[in-house]
C-alpha cells in the first residue's frame, strides 16, 4: 500500500474511531442504537481529524492537540448540546449543574471541568493516540492535503449543524446571548493559544522513564480518579479533578521530554484512557432506553473491540520502533567512523 493510500486509511480510521470512543465505548449508546453514528461521525470524527491535521501540519504536538480539544469541548457543550448551561439536559433529571453552581455564569463548576476533561483527553486525545498507534510510520506526519483538510472541516461543520438541530428540536432550553458570546470568545482564545505556545522540542533529557505498561496503567487509574470524583463534595470534587489533571499533565510534561520516551509510551496513555472508558461503561446505563442484557452485551462487545484495537496498535508500534532501531544500527555500521581531529 502506498503512502497516500495509508494516509487516507489512517484518516478514515480516526474519523470512525472517534465517535466509537466518545459515545459507544463510554457506554452512552448500545449496539442496537447505531444509527446516530451517521451524525456523530462528522462531529467527533471530523473534529478529531481536523484537530490532528492542524497540529501535525504546523509541526506541533500534543499541547496543541489538547488545547484545540478544549476549544472543541466548548463548541460541543456550549453550542451543540448546551449542556454547560442546561440544568436538565435532555430531561435526564441528573442535576449535573448543581455541583459547584456559579449563579453569575449559569454553569456548574464540576460539570464544566468534567466536560473539559472528557473531550480533550478522551474524545480527541485517546482517539488520535490510538489512530496514530495503528499507523506508526505516519504518526507525526499529516494524513491529508489541503482538499482533505477542507473536507474534514466541512464534515465537522455538518456534524455541528445536525447535532445542534437535533438538540434544539428535542429540548426547548436556550442559553442566554451573553453565555453564547463568552463561549465563542473562549473558543477563539483556546484555539489561538494552541498555536501561540512554543512547539515541543525533541526530548533531550537523559533521565529514565517508566515502562510503557506503567504509564498505561497510570493513565487508566488517573482517568478513573476523574470519573469517580465525589460529586457530592461539590467544590471539593472540582478541586479533586484539578489535582488529578495537575498530576497527569505535570508527569506527562516531565517524562515526554526525556529521550527515552517513545511512541509506545504515547500509545499507552491512549490505551489506558480507552480501557478506562470501556470498564466504566459497566457502571453507567445508556442514555437511551434498552434492556439490561443488551446494554451489558454492548459494553462487553465494545470493550473487546477496544482491547483488539489497542493490541493491534501496540504490535504495529513495536514493530515500527524495532524496524527503526535496526535501520539506525545498519546505517551506523555502514558509515565509517570519523576521526575526532583532522
Give, region by region, the residue ranges found by the protein language model.
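Aromatic-anchored segments of alpha-helical transmembrane domains
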Residues: 17-24, 71-78, 153-163, 219-228, ...
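Extended, charged low-complexity segments
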Residues: 200-333, 337-342
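N-terminal membrane topogenic signal
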Residues: 1-12, 209-213
